[in-house]
């Protein structure tokens, strides 16, 4: 049986999204067979080691929690965050990342924000950094159940 196909970078993102919890990472890869999951466990351990020992700082992230300080957003940014939250709630789990990316740009343009500024705001809100993994894919990997509570803080 062939190994489960997931790019190492994506696997590293899952490891960070789920704070290194191997079983939660595997639960997101629900189409993997049991034998593939055994091999994935080894790859997950390799990803953890790479993140710990070799990953550049800009590659590392952790999702914000209720204990983290809120980003000081202006009125338009708050409206854009709330619009984006609505799009995540209503559409994220119903479409692929390419389709969903249109809603990212819509949340920015509907609130008078340049795309680059909106991306900076959303990354800061989600991971406390101005840049991060490709946004649509990252949000899709996290899932609405993870992203919505963070966005609803605003």
Report each predicted region and the residues it spans:
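Feature 926 captures the class I aminoacyl-tRNA synthetase adenylation module centered on the KMSKS loop
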Residues: 1-95, 99-111, 118, 152
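Amphipathic alpha-helical/coiled-coil segments positioned at domain termini
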Residues: 105, 111-150
């Amino acid at each position: 049986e062939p190994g489960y196909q997931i790019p190492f970078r994506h696997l590293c993102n899952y490891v960070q999204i789920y704070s290194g919890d191997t079983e939660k990472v595997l639960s997101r890869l629900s189409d993997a067979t049991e034998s593939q999951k055994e091999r994935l466990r080894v790859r997950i351990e390799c990803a953890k080691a790479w993140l710990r020992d070799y990953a550049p700082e800009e590659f590392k992230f952790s999702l914000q929690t209720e204990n983290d300080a809120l980003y000081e957003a202006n009125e338009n940014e708050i409206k854009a965050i709330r619009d984006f939250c609505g799009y995540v709630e209503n559409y994220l789990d119903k479409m692929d990342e390419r389709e969903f990316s249109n809603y990212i740009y819509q949340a920015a343009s509907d609130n008078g924000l340049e795309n680059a500024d909106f991306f900076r705001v959303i990354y800061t809100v989600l991971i406390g950094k101005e840049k991060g993994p490709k946004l649509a894919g990252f949000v899709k990997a996290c899932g609405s159940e993870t992203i919505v509570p963070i966005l609803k803080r605003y």
